[in-house]
Amino acid sequence: MKLKLKLPNPGLDERIPSHAELEKLELEEAGERPQWDNKAQYMLTCVGFCVGLGNVWRFPYLCQSHGGGAFMIPFLILLVLEGIPLLHLEFAIGQRLRKGSVGVWRSINPYLVGVGIASMLVSFMVGMYYNTIIAWVLWYFFNSFQDPLPWSQCPVNENRTGFVSECEDSSPVDYFWYRKTLNTTPVIEDSGGLQWWIVLCLFCAWTLLWVCCLRGIETTGKAVYVTSTLPYLVLTIFLIRGLTLKGSVSGIKFLFTPDLDELLNPSTWLDAGAQVFYSFSLAFGGLISFSSYNSVHNNCEQDAVIISIINGLTSIYAAIVIYSIIGFRATERFDDCLNGNILTLMNTFDLPEGNITESNYDGFLQHLNSTVPAVFQDLQLKTCDMQTFLSQGVEGTGLAFIVFTEAITKMPISPLWSVLFFIMLFCLGLSTMFGSVEGVVVPLQDLNILPKRWPKEVYTGLVCLVSFGLAIIFAQGSGEYWLALFDGFAGSIPLLIIAFCEMMAVAYIYGIDRFNDDIKFMIGHKPNFFWQATWRLVSPLIVLLIFLFYFVTTVSKELTYIAWDPQSENFPTLETKSYPDWIYAIIFILSGVPALVIPAVALYKLIRNRYFFAPSDSRFSNSCISDKYCPPNKPYINGEMIYYLFSFNFL
């Protein structure tokens, strides 16, 4: 009986007639590059890289602040028109050329090497501060093995006559975060010195990351079985627990109650586009590297669609979980506010217990206001409004380390829920860092600026060590301000520019027809009209619009940061402060340098090839990738120093 040949994708049967031919092609295409043990490892790694902390603490906030369920409409539309096409493009070029971000763009055109270097620089800078967040998570995780939790109550003062005033004026969760964890300074200019506990946690975070990335995909491929799946288990546990808590349904209803007027607000669409872009971890180079370890005939188109769907659904699922807990927190705050007012009324008017209840509270207030208005005004009762408590949504570190930790303190067996929550955040952050490290190590190897004989363990260790040394800046008292600066500028404008260059390079420099042929070679059929339209026009246009809007709004407004200042008049409200003038130089390094690397490298290669290229010199024999891109013969300018300067072949 003749066995039917099972091919990786339909449509390859005309080119691959037998099992022997298939095995031969796979071996030839694989070369010496490592490969994934199985498809599950690759998919879990990509999901772990794409699904990160932003899905948990930024997407729910955007939903709540942009019309609830109405925000889903632009989010899903832009996910299809922007996220999936660019994800497919990065998967395809990495898989076809089997190289990292630098090697891929060098192969497409030597003048595009700067795109890969820019991706590497952004991955390096983002990884530095992202792993600091993991260090904070570890600090909270270590402190979760206490009952009661250390952020559940204020500490007593030195005289033991009362509580610490800074904590009394704010809240236990605020005090533990800003004072006990960060020891925050009131201004960014005041470093506040190193906080040794954060330095230790930072060292643990980078050491754990190095161990997991020790041998590239050989080790990360094993780790993702835990880091990419455990967050879903913990989210499900929190959802089940959240739905049993009082007020959880109110939070979910508040999240998804649509305000269709928000669809007419341009910022809603631009925030949705930015969230899609960043939640896919596009333009970092990590996805290109991961896909390069695939078989050339892997169905990258199908992978892009599946991972995009998982990413989008995870964002929605996480929002439901988060707002079920926020609904519980808002209900607890509402009840505390109401009970406090009732107690004040009972003491003022000497009323018996149970005389005022939640059901007759509003009527009783109206009665007092009409009968004894002067006394009523002097009471200064708090405003207890459920919608106000629900709308006090925050994003980022505020959601994780303040809002959620406060909600956890109100749960029974709070240490258990705290441990689970920070394990989930740790896994989300760590799996994302796998891609960031890959986005630095692989291009570093492709650039050949370090000895080739060094094993990958040394490359990874060197990247982690240098990153740890530079990330010490985030362990200062002003560390949170520096982290916010890096987050706002290192991972914004440069990524948009890189993504735009990627799409334009593939569509108009490499050529969309050649790219279509490559995809047909890999998966057996050419991309359909949807992919053609998005790659050629729609996706680049969306990215360009997001970039222009972001650039214009950033340039036109004064740059400020939010500071914790116990001496301010409005404390505990966070104070908005202006950056010092010298900070603009830092912003240029974070945003400008990675973006300018792209034209700078192209200009360097143009000058070198046109004026300093010696075709007969053996040291330049490998300076171009193919005959098509080799420059014409130009006069060679002698001079030992100039010759040495332009003879490097790492670009």
Q: Where are the predicted features?
A:
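Juxtamembrane transmembrane-helix boundary signature
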Residues: 39, 44-45, 51, 73-109, ...
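Extracellular/lumenal N-termini and interhelical loops of multi-pass eukaryotic membrane proteins
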Residues: 131-190, 248-262, 329-405, 499, ...
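Hydrophobic, membrane-embedded alpha-helices of multi-pass small-molecule transporters
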Residues: 44-54, 126, 131, 168, ...
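Transmembrane helix-boundary motif of multi-pass solute transporters/channels
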Residues: 41-77, 88, 213-219, 286-294, ...
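Membrane-interface "cap" regions at the ends of multi-pass membrane proteins
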Residues: 2-57, 86-91, 101, 114, ...
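Membrane-embedded translocation segments of transport machinery
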Residues: 2, 6-36, 217, 221-437, ...
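A generic transmembrane alpha-helix motif of multi-pass inner-membrane proteins
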Residues: 130, 472-474, 484-507, 527-627, ...
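Transmembrane helix-loop boundary segments of multi-pass membrane transporters
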Residues: 60-78, 109-110, 218-227, 270, ...
